[in-house]
Amino acid sequence: MKRGLLFLLGFFVVAGVGAYFYYGKAPPSAEGFSNETTPNLASLVKTRTSTEQPNVIILLADDLGWADVGYHGSDIKTPNIDRLAKEGMRLERFYATPICTPTRSAMMTGRDPIKLGLANAVLMAWQDGGVSLDEKFMPESFKDAGYDTAMIGKWHLGHTIEQHLPNARGFDHFYGHVNTQVDYFNHEFAKGHDFQENGKIVDNKGEYATDVHGDQSVRFLTELRDKTKPFFLYVPFLAPHSPIEAKQEDIDKYPRRIDTPVGPKKTYAAMVDSMDQAIGRILDTLDEQGIADNTIILFYSDNGGYPNFGADNTPLRGGKLETFEGGIRVAAVMRWPEVLPANTVNDAVISVIDLFPTLASAAGITAGNVKEIDGVDRWQAVLGKGDHWRGKPLIFTSNIPLYNHFQYGVLDGKWKMVQTVNHLRRETEVETLLFDVSADPNEKSDLATKHPEQVKRLTAILDDRLAEHPVGGTFVQISPHPGWRAPKDYADVVLPADKVNQAPHEGFGAVASKFLQQRYGDKGKIIYE
């Protein structure tokens, strides 16, 4: 009963349920770590002597809370993540999106998820969508530059046609699952098996998914990669996303925590612990192969944690699904021993949208998306030489269907607006909050009435973006279409590329775009009348 209840709760969380406002005292500074931004950071950056292209590894946690790592004061044992922080640079103003599919699409394309039709929700197993085939993904650029590319873990960017899968989006090797919320032990979602290697079914039931992710990453590093090339390795862990499941030996490490039907903190802690162990095996392998110094490692979470399942975003407000800081500002660390100074703190604002151009710049390659990239190259900011602010506003959006509302966030410099639009049966309510996040990062003081000019300015930024890109694309679908059944194995039901029409169709907006532009100008608002 407990496991079934947790699965049901997790299903609703994936779909965008349950705003949660979390307040608390700031966690104590972990021993050996400072919460203060490192002064004169640029002077500590090392001059690189090697001419070899660096390897790149992205380690992505799923729903990890801000305070769920040791270096932020957690009691969860994360010695390997802490090691990355000790040997690298903490990015303390790193922003993702409130939910996972938008974060992943932004990272892979360098584009605003609202332009991809993926800003508001996650892709579920019964949805056929994915990122447009017109977009060029980050691993494609690394592959074009001579890198060996691999992905181990959770995809979640389209799974029903061949061109949406990792092997068609720049990855030479893929081992993992295409859906979210796959059972950690039996590897099923909605009774359909979901683990594969390059399109072929993998039957490894009984093995804990996080262990598989770690072991397969080590396998790539030791056996599969072409050692004559640099490599790009993307490891999106499922952990600590629901279903809340862990190995008993890891659960037993946290006797002082208590599991309850809502907020299974003991099991959640064990899931984070297991992910950290997997990261440790990857780090050890890099050391054993003598390639750690020339490998860029980026660790971050795809969104904030969900407190009802045990995550802790203290002292930030809110959590997953929300555009408050607790939902979008995430734990992030970058390590590159040849270049970045150890045990440093960088508070430059960096977005997940910026990762494609930033990592490309660090590696000395071209970020080759054929579409205009919205992300900003923040590599100089990482080195302590660039501007603290990224120069362009960040817009966040989330659809929470059980509450029938959207929540938006606009961050521009020190000012941040959070706007909640409640669609009631007979009317719509709009609540607008304004924060100075440089002085009030925990968003305790609403300044909307004191600074109406900032509310007006940020609202105009949001309105212009929504007018240019009307709310559309993927919406949260918390239940499948009538009659839908999961396939026995998701790897078996992919539509081959030669069976898919190659001409994109964007819907009513594309068909009527000239008429709409004549009527509304270059914004081309979509109306139905």
Positions of the model-derived regions?
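Active-site segment of extracytoplasmic enzymes that catalyze sulfate/phosphate-ester chemistry
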Residues: 21, 33, 37, 58, ...
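A short beta-strand-to-alpha-helix junction
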Residues: 51-52, 74-78, 95-99, 125-136, ...
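Loop/turn elements at helix/coil->beta-strand transitions in domains of secreted/extracellular proteins
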Residues: 52-57, 87-92, 144-150, 170-172, ...
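C-terminal cap/loop subdomain of S1 sulfatases and analogous C-terminal strand-loop tails that border
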Residues: 164, 172-173, 178-181, 305-311, ...
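Formylglycine-dependent
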Residues: 118-120, 125-128, 132-144, 157-230, ...
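Short, solvent-exposed turn/loop segments enriched in Gly/Ser/Thr/Pro and often Arg
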Residues: 70-76, 90-111, 151-163, 177-181, ...
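Histidine-centered active-site microenvironments of extracellular/periplasmic hydrolases
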Residues: 162-170, 243-247, 284-339, 351
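Long, internal low-complexity/basic segments
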Residues: 4-8, 14-54, 61, 65, ...
